[in-house]
Amino acid sequence: GLAESIRAADSIHPIATHHMGGQAMAFPNDPNIRVFGQQTTKNTPEAMHDDAGKQGWGNWVYVMAEAHPWHKDLIDAELNNAAGRAPMRRSQWATAMAGGYVMMYDAFESGDPTDAMFDDLRRLKLFMEGTPFNRMAPLFDDALTTAKLDGTKYVLSNPAQGLYILYGDVNTGKLGVRNAPVGNYSLRWFDPVTGVTVNQSGSVVAGGLASFTKPAGVGPEA
């Protein structure tokens, strides 16, 4: 096939696919294609994380390339009445917490995203780059419901290594997770809206309930 021919001529660069027919990877068994740029028609952060995330996840790099027309509508809403930034940011975090990379779709059109929207995406990028996210996996469905505690909405985790990224989107007073290994933890609180970071320490005792109160200075998203 085409990907095989490209790989024969270029052994270095990753080969990606982006297709408009369906959200699931169309070439899951092609060893030459290792990047999937997904296009979805979902229009809520929850659906982006759940359905789009589960279909995008696999033995390849997962990139949320388009959420059309929702993301375009959010850009227009932000430009018209400052109503699109928050749902766009939550959508991007939902994708990241599903194991995906994020593109700012429609950035090349006449109605460009605002600087604040780009700043939100950069904060997400910098946060993830400061974590070992590549050693964690997203939780979905019953596994997510069983694990999350307090204001936690999405979870990336590697319990065997005691690694967790927890995200809460609205009025987050605490973040927590069940069945965490007993021990002492380094906590890094992060505000996706402002970039404020607070470092703390915490511990988990027998029973595995890890529940931590959000510190002052971090807003309702954390």
Question: What annotation goes with each model-predicted range?
Answer:
Residues G1-A116:
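Extracellular glycoside hydrolase catalytic/binding regions
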Residues V61, W70-D73, G84-G202, L209-A222:
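Aromatic- and carboxylate-lined catalytic core of secreted/periplasmic carbohydrate-active enzymes
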